[in-house]
């Protein structure tokens, strides 16, 4: 599970955002029509990636994918899912230093200072907090309990635009180097996992 309930930022109106990973039968790749790389549903706000697509995005340090691997709310896992979680550090690399800041910057540029979308502003700050924790400690910060009150104040529009941009600038400035992250992900370990998973799905 991801979203506000995983971050510790849920309110009474919050949806339940589910994200998952599935393994397509190996024989389905032998056909001309390949299996989907992702599917939506069957529940509302549910989205799942085929395992190879998921691993590819994780190796690229996609923030959403990396936070899925560290989500504290897990509803169901299979043996393949347990193994995926056990190798989650293999996906980490210094490129996350760029992707987290880049994603947050893209959100910031879409905000209108005259009429800010405060929920989006909150998640922009939350993403920077998560990425900074990842750079310093080697794993993203998913639950933001220590920052909950201030983040929710942003969402309610109780902080001024200047205060939000100042908080953003302080966080961006702190991204001076990748810190605890390795230069490259452990692609060999990820490929071994994929091969074993495909063999098990024959």
Task: Name each region found by the language model.
Residues 8-11, 42-43, 112-120:
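Conserved aromatic-histidine-acidic binding/catalytic patches
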Residues 76-196:
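Conserved nucleotidyltransferase catalytic core and NTase-mimicking acidic/glycine-rich helix/loop elements
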Residues 60, 195-196, 200:
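N-terminal secretory/targeting leader peptides
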Residues 1-2, 48:
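Short hydrophobic/aromatic segments of transmembrane alpha-helices and their interfaces
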Residues 3-40, 124:
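Catalytic metal-binding acidic patch
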Residues 21, 32, 53-57, 126-133:
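Residue-level signal for well-ordered alpha-helical scaffold segments within enzymatic catalytic domains
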């Amino acid at each position: 599970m991801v979203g506000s309930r995983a971050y510790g930022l849920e309110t009474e109106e919050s949806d339940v955002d589910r994200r998952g990973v599935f393994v397509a039968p190996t024989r389905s790749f032998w056909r001309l029509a390949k299996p989907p790389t992702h599917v939506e549903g069957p529940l509302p706000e549910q989205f799942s990636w085929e395992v190879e697509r998921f691993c590819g995005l994780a190796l690229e340090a996609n923030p959403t994918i990396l936070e899925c691997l560290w989500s504290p709310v897990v509803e169901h896992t299979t043996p393949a899912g347990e193994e995926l979680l056990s190798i989650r550090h293999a996906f980490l690399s210094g490129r996350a230093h760029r992707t987290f800041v880049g994603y947050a910057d893209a959100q910031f540029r879409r905000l209108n200072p005259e009429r800010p979308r405060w929920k989006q502003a909150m998640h922009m700050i939350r993403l920077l907090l998560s990425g900074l924790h990842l750079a310093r400690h080697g794993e993203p910060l998913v639950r933001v309990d220590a920052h909950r009150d201030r983040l929710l104040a942003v969402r309610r529009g109780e902080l001024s635009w200047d205060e939000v941009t100042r908080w953003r600038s302080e966080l961006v400035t702190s991204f001076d180097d990748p810190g605890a992250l390795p230069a490259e992900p452990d692609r060999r370990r990820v490929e071994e996992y994929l091969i074993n998973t495909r063999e098990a799905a024959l």
